[in-house]
């Protein structure tokens, strides 16, 4: 049987920093394989979005705030709406980081 979808619900939850980074590198390597299934990752922490992720869906209270190409979804404005406070987003080497401003 061919797997077409891999759904990971908060896979880095309860991991320390080293464990999280190891997991993300493994997910990045797995997802970069052309034969890998489509991968959906659910997270509340943008730091846990693996490099190479192409699309995102941002929800607040079950409603879509933004969807599409990840760079157009993970923005200061969208995350500020999602979290209800001013957020500054930065990216480095394909990874995202946020902080309250």
Where are the predicted features?
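ABC ATPase nucleotide-binding domains
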Residues: 80-101
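Catalytic Walker B motif of ABC-type/P-loop ATPase nucleotide-binding domains
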Residues: 6-10
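ABC-family nucleotide-binding domains
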Residues: 16
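Helical segment within the ABC ATPase nucleotide-binding domain
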Residues: 20-35
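ABC ATPase "signature
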Residues: 67-68
């Amino acid at each position: 049987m061919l797997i077409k979808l891999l759904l990971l619900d908060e896979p880095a939850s309860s991991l320390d920093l080293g464990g999280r980074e190891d997991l993300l590198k493994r997910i990045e390597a797995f997802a970069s394989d052309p034969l890998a299934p489509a991968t959906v990752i659910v997270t509340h922490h943008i730091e846990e979005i693996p490099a190479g992720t192409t699309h995102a869906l941002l929800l607040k209270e079950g409603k879509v705030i933004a969807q599409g190409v990840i760079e157009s979804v993970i923005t200061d404005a969208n995350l500020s709406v999602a979290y209800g406070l001013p957020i500054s987003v930065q990216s480095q080497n394909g990874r995202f980081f946020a902080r309250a401003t």
